[in-house]
Amino acid sequence: MVIYIDIDETICRSPDVPDYTVSYPITENIQKANALYDEGHTIVYWTARGAKTGIDWREHTEKQFKEWGVKYHELKLNKPYYDLFIDDKNMNTLNWDNNFIQEIGDDN
């Protein structure tokens, strides 16, 4: 299964957007995402970092991922900035439990 995961307020707190240098990890969510990686799922992080400012945050984000122990296959920085995302395959971290794979079916 290919799983796209947002970064800010999903696997880290970013209290001073757009200054991502002060972001800090949400360890519990990183562990959940890493478990999905370890189970063989393809993990792609997709972020809107720099979408409004034009700043390229790739190098800094990759450094943060290394420091935080984030496992992933790909990092995409071209996510558009939006206020609300409505989708048929969406999940909120408040309800994140790795049993969702069994609930929706695993095409891995």
Regions found by a protein language model. Give the residues of each.
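Catalytic phosphate/metal-binding cores of nucleic-acid and nucleotide-processing enzymes, i.e., regions
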Residues: 1-108
